[in-house]
């Protein structure tokens, strides 16, 4: 079976939900994007899809703390998880957001990959490591994007990339680390390739149905 390259430029918004219980049916394939509030997550989604306003940014913590679903095509979805790490948000709200993130990452069966975005100058903060740990515990592969890579000179960028690649080895998971920059389009091809790989992993339960109808 040949692999399909998806056209992320046609991605469109579907719905928002406060937690996993308000999401659409747990079917198809989803890849989630997670990151601290200032990691450049919205910019990465907008760059990937070539749509400036697809993932809206908010200057006010709490305004965008929903799980946002975008559809590439039927059954193929990108999921924008709530940004984490707002310093000025009350502890109770932080715990609520983290609970919603944890439930999604560990209970959503159609989740096939997690993209964690981190500022290349400040990678692997506590909550970043928690995201990775949650994913590894349930066998979900992870792509770590070190954002704002254009802020560092080439040598410093490579040094940070190598440092993070070594630092994630103890997680014992399927973790790929790449440099990324939305303005300079660094790493966009690597992101697209990884998404195509994950989205081409057809859920086993779909295969018999396709085979049965192939000869009709």
UniProtKB/Swiss-Prot annotation:
HAMAP family to which the protein is assigned, alphabetical: GTPase_EngB
Any GO BP: division septum assembly
Keyword Cell division: yes
Protein family: Belongs to the TRAFAC class TrmE-Era-EngA-EngB-Septin-like GTPase superfamily. EngB GTPase family.
Organism: Serratia proteamaculans (strain 568)
Residues binding Mg(2+), per UniProt: 42, 64
GO cellular component, one term: cytosol
Keywords: Cell cycle, Cell division, GTP-binding, Magnesium, Metal-binding, Nucleotide-binding, Septation
Amino acids binding GTP: 35-42, 62-66, 80-83, 147-150, 180-182
Keyword Cell cycle: yes
Domain EngB-type G: 27-201
An example Gene Ontology molecular-function term: GTP binding
Stored Gene3D superfamilies: P-loop containing nucleotide triphosphate hydrolases
Cofactor(s) it depends on: Mg(2+)
Protein function: Necessary for normal cell division and for the maintenance of normal septation.
InterPro entries with a match to the protein in the record: G_ENGB_dom, GTP-bd, GTP-bd_ribosome_bio_YsxC, P-loop_NTPase
Full protein name: Probable GTP-binding protein EngB
